[in-house]
Amino acid sequence: MKCFSDSFLAKNGYKIILIGHKDHPEVVGTMGQISKEKIILVETINDAKNLNINEPVAYVTQTTLSVDDTKDIIQILKDRFPHIKDPLKEDICYATTNRQMAVKNIAKRCDLFFVIGSRNSSNSVRLVEVAKKSGCSNSILIHSQSKI
């Protein structure tokens, strides 16, 4: 659904700003579905500050990024482009957001926090980052039962 929505916006005159990491499979796939003239990748706050776009714009985010990771960039985009189109509600990955919020709430009360998942999973890596930012500096990604 997400790529369809992004393509629809691009075909209807919008320049798409994709907030994400260039080597992430979701970003690579999304950027491969839309003509290069219609999509631009923003990875950092500076990228957002330096955009020069003179056409209608919409933004989408890599679904595995935390809300905290994207909020500052989104605010800059909204300040710079007051008529920017938000992502469709169904394009937002609530499972990812819910997990990150749960980790945020729990990690601040923990001395040790394990995330069980693949080292190649952006979701797992991001959950460790969220736990650390939320107050549990001893947060660890466990990719194998033998590592516990």
PLM region spans:
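The feature marks the mature, well-folded catalytic cores of soluble enzymes
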Residues: M1-I148
